[in-house]
Regions:
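Acidic/His-rich structured neighborhood in mature extracellular/periplasmic domains
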Residues: 61-226
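Sec-dependent signal peptide recognition
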Residues: 2-7
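C-terminal motif of bacterial Sec signal peptides marking the signal peptidase cleavage site
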Residues: 13-15
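Sec-exported extracytoplasmic/periplasmic mature domains
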Residues: 44-48, 57, 61-71, 178-182, ...
Length: 331
């Protein structure tokens, strides 16, 4: 009821297009909540498949580890499960001007401005993307398996990710729970990069605790590859930023822009889409841009997670310029 009343108030304060957006947000969140049933109910149900049963039991153990060993919130999140019967829970639409590497901000009354707009319907997401393209923006659509309500509600396990390999399931749960620890308004890169550092440290500790050394080595290798990709994206983004700020003609900028994306696709064609553009770079940067800074902060905290979280909460409440200086944010 709190969700409905809050969002209904928001719709009364917004224009027609915003009313439509919040209406789908209300409906989408309510559908997720209605579909959720306690884990014990699913585990006791004879119709639950052995594969799903095993994953739910694994998720419960991971959830317990998160609170017991990682000092992540101990609450009702991930104590229930919802079968959504679709591949993603939401579709995020990222947009950036044709000659800019900065995101078009999407601003909301309670969460502040973020670097994307999320839709519970792929059709609505694609329609919004087409409108943005018509206005001259670069656009990238990303299907999302999970999201956090920032502790406002008890987030359920979802069919969109429950069958992930166990390491990836743990990674996702640690990431989403981290969003309940600290949240900075108007700073998507801060929030997502922090959650990435928590998820990675969490998975390392989780694997070590079980003596799964082979999987730990594989995870470390995968993270190293991700760092290399993130570095290449950051370099491409930096070069494009300089190109866009230059006095070159739009024709010259467009040519150099195309060359940069050809180069990036040649290096990482397996993960860079054919239609990669400025918005795609934004979608990567928000999850990677500040990771090195948070890793340093964790090291400075001696690996003590509660101390690390306390420092991050202080930063989240501070002026953005102070955060940028400490985390050495790159363009």
């Amino acid at each position: 009821m709190r969700l409905v009343l809050t969002l209904l108030l928001v719709t009364l304060l917004c224009g027609c297009e915003s009313v439509a957006f919040y209406a789908q947000a209300i409906g989408g969140q309510l559908n997720v909540m209605r579909a959720a049933r306690p884990l014990d109910s699913w585990l006791a149900d004879p119709q639950t498949t052995p594969e799903l049963r095993a994953r739910l039991e694994s998720a419960r153990r991971i959830r317990q580890f998160a609170s017991r060993e990682l000092a992540l919130p101990e609450n009702g999140s991930y104590a229930s499960y919802a079968d959504l019967r679709r591949p993603y829970v939401v579709w995020n639409v990222f947009a950036a001007p044709r000659f800019s590497v900065e995101a078009k901000p999407e601003c909301f009354p309670f969460t502040g401005c973020v670097s994307y707009r999320g839709f519970f319907s792929e059709k609505l997401a694609r329609a919004h993307a087409e409108r943005l393209r018509g206005d001259g923006y670069d656009v990238h659509i990303a299907g999302v398996p999970a999201y956090s309500t920032l502790g406002w509600f008890d987030d359920p396990l979802l069919s969109t990710f429950i069958l992930y390999p166990e390491v990836q399931l743990a990674r996702l749960l640690f990431h989403e729970l981290a969003h309940q620890v600290a949240y900075a308004r108007d700073d998507t890169a801060f929030n997502e990069s922090f959650a990435v550092v928590v998820e990675e440290e969490g998975v390392r500790r989780w694997l070590r605790a079980q003596g799964r050394t082979t999987e730990l080595a594989a995870f470390r290798a995968a993270q190293a590859r991700k760092r290399e990709f993130a570095a290449s994206v950051a370099q491409t983004r930096a070069r494009l930023g300089q190109i866009y700020k230059s006095d070159a003609t739009e024709q010259a900028k467009a040519r150099q822009k195309a060359e940069e994306f050809v180069r990036l696709r040649a290096e990482y064609g397996n993960v860079v889409p054919t239609e990669a553009n400025n918005a795609f770079l934004v979608s990567v940067a928000v999850y990677t841009q500040l990771v090195p800074g948070f890793e340093r902060l964790l090291a400075d905290s001696g690996g003590n997670l509660p101390a690390f979280y306390a420092r991050v909460r202080e930063l989240a409440a501070s002026e953005r310029s102070s955060r940028d200086t400490l985390l050495a944010r790159r363009p």
